[in-house]
């Protein structure tokens, strides 16, 4: 299988009271094209840090992130922002939708920032909302949506620009079990239907078992799970 995202010898160190705090130590990982991979690890293990590095939101202390065969280690902040905007979609535990805009507008705006015409952005946004069965809420603001509806809108926003990689940090962690299962099924179906590659952090091993592979963080390295 062809690699879409590679983490190579990733190290991430912080300093706490003048002492180094090592979060990741020579961590390696390959996400293949079309794969759905679960990142299963307890709170505080470094899941969010790993996702932020993979998504070019945070620079590693050492190592390289290779996206679609392109090294990102020495890219400028502007270059990293452009790569992230075009190639990476994010979904978080809390939706982070813009409260003053409707569900539809929340999906249109990132596309227009990326350079899409409004008519094209609106058409794609409506198709995504329809696919995720939340089109009837298109003109409602986030505060008027249920938790599950908010997350489905957030998923639509994350994939609207046509990224090659989707990164999700506990996307169902704030939902009840029934809604969580529904949102996960919607997310995984969209990933498979669109040919995306996805790395999804979750505490839910039942959901993780439905993905192609499972990884965890052990002794500050990335380890495959059965």
UniProtKB/Swiss-Prot annotation:
It is found in: Cell inner membrane. It comes from Bartonella quintana (strain Toulouse). Part of the ABC transporter complex LolCDE involved in the translocation of mature outer membrane-directed lipoproteins, from the inner membrane to the periplasmic chaperone, LolA. Responsible for the formation of the LolA-lipoprotein complex in an ATP-dependent manner. Disulfide bonds: none annotated. GO terms for molecular function: ATP binding; ATP hydrolysis activity; transmembrane transporter activity. GO terms for biological process: lipoprotein localization to outer membrane; protein localization to outer membrane. Residues 5-225 form the ABC transporter domain. PROSITE patterns: ABC_TRANSPORTER_1, ABC_TRANSPORTER_2, LOLD. InterPro entries: AAA+_ATPase, ABC_transporter-like_ATP-bd, ABC_transporter-like_CS, ABC_transpr_LolD-like, MacB-like_ATP-bd, P-loop_NTPase. PANTHER family: IMPORT ATP-BINDING PROTEIN, LIPOPROTEIN-RELEASING SYSTEM ATP-BINDING PROTEIN LOLD. Belongs to the ABC transporter superfamily. Lipoprotein translocase (TC 3.A.1.125) family. ATP binds at residues 41-48. Gene3D superfamilies: P-loop containing nucleotide triphosphate hydrolases. This is Lipoprotein-releasing system ATP-binding protein LolD. The complex is composed of two ATP-binding proteins (LolD) and two transmembrane proteins (LolC and LolE). It holds the Pfam family ABC_tran.
């Amino acid at each position: 299988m062809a690699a879409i995202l590679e983490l190579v010898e990733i190290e991430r160190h912080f300093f706490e009271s003048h002492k180094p705090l090592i979060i990741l130590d020579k961590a390696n990982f390959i996400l293949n094209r079309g794969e759905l991979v679960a990142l299963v690890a307890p709170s505080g293990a470094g899941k969010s840090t790993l996702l932020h590095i993979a998504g070019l939101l945070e620079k590693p202390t050492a190592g390289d992130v290779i996206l679609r065969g392109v090294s990102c280690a020495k890219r400028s902040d502007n270059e990293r922002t452009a790569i992230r905007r075009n190639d990476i979609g994010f979904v978080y535990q809390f939706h982070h939708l813009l409260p003053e805009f409707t569900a539809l507008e929340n999906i249109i705006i990132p596309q227009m920032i990326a350079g899409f015409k409004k008519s094209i952005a609106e058409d794609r946004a409506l198709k995504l909302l329809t696919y995720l069965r939340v089109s009837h809420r298109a003109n409602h603001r986030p505060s008027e949506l249920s938790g599950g509806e908010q997350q489905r809108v957030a998923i639509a926003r994350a994939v609207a620009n046509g990224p090659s990689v989707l990164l999700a940090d506990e996307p169902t962690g704030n939902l009840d079990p029934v809604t969580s299962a529904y949102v996960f099924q919607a997310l995984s179906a969209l990933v498979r239907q669109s040919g995306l590659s996805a790395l999804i952090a979750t505490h839910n091993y039942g959901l993780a078992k439905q993905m192609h592979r499972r990884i965890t963080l052990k002794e500050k390295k990335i380890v495959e799970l059965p």
